[in-house]
């Protein structure tokens, strides 16, 4: 292979990598020596705190980990980036939102469409077309305290039999990895490919913020009739737009 061919191959590989991780072809004229300097220069990484989604960085809101100015995905640990951050591990990413809109079509599971490497991915908001926020799908259970063992259903949890993934206080979906969670206490985070449509589709917007808390499902709070509802934009407290589910 001559030097010119090696040069072209190197740039082609770089462009494919950049597209796959950022979702767009970079402006080559902007790739100066400072393009990939970390946004947190001289700021200590805070691995003890959890990711906060969405977070605001340089005026834009992000619902997932990003690679802006970095080769490794990271997130802010404050709602507005103030120099506090951490590198993202698999269990730091937000959960998939199903259904989600991509290129005007509703999807109820992870898809490969639009991915050069045909890797499964999902949107982390109700509309990829609107927010362009996404992540690769986990195809196996991960995290938890059982070394990523697969879900076991049915299982006993709090003296009841459960048959599907459960939502915890951090909006993560988890599952028991033994037949009796009450006795064994073993669990994993659910694979994204195990999850299907859990919430209504358009016009609900998931997640949405109500009284400064994120919700990933329809809720009954704030209604006298105990009917469930959802916001149709991320910030209900600002926009006050909603529908019954």
UniProtKB/Swiss-Prot annotation:
Detected in epididymal duct epithelium, cauda epididymidal fluid and on sperm membrane (at protein level). SMART domains: FN2. Its main location: secreted. GO terms for molecular function: heparin binding. One of its GO terms (cellular component) is cell surface. Residues 1-23 form the signal peptide. GO terms for biological process: single fertilization; sperm capacitation. The keyword GTP-binding does not apply. The keyword Repeat applies. Residues 46-90, 91-139, 146-192, 199-245 form the Fibronectin type-II domain. Keywords: Disulfide bond, Fertilization, Repeat, Secreted, Signal. Disulfide bonds join 51-75, 65-88, 96-122, 110-137, 151-175, 165-190, 204-230, 218-245. PANTHER family: SEMINAL PLASMA PROTEIN, SEMINAL PLASMA PROTEIN HSP-1. Belongs to the seminal plasma protein family. Binds to spermatozoa upon ejaculation and may play a role in sperm capacitation. Has phosphorylcholine-binding activity. This is Epididymal sperm-binding protein 1. It comes from Canis lupus familiaris (Dog). The lineage of its organism: Eukaryota, Metazoa, Chordata, Craniata, Vertebrata. The gene is ELSPBP1.
């Amino acid at each position: 292979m001559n030097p010119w061919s090696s040069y072209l191959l190197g740039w082609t590989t770089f462009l494919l990598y950049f597209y796959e991780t950022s979702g767009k072809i970079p402006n080559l004229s902007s790739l100066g020596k400072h393009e990939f300097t970390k946004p947190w220069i001289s700021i200590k990484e805070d691995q003890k705190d959890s990711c906060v989604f969405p977070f605001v960085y340089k005026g834009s809101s992000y619902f997932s980990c990003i690679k802006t100015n970095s080769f490794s995905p990271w997130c802010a640990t404050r709602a507005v980036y103030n120099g506090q951050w951490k590198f993202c591990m698999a269990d730091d990413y937000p959960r998939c939102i199903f259904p989600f809109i991509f290129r005007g079509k509703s999807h109820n599971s992870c898809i490969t469409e639009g991915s050069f490497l045909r890797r499964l991915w999902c949107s982390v908001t109700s509309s990829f077309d609107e927010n362009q926020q996404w992540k690769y799908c986990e195809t196996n259970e991960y995290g938890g305290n059982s070394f990523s063992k697969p879900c076991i259903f049915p299982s006993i949890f709090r003296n009841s039999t459960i048959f599907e993934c459960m939502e915890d206080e951090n909006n993560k979906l988890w599952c028991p990895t033994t037949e009796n969670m009450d006795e064994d206490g073993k669990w994993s985070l659910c694979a994204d490919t195990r999850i299907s449509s859990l919430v209504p589709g358009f016009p609900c917007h998931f997640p949405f913020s109500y009284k400064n808390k994120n919700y990933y499902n329809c809720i009954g709070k704030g209604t006298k009739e105990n009917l469930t509802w959802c916001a149709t934009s991320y910030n209900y407290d600002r926009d006050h737009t909603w529908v019954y589910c």
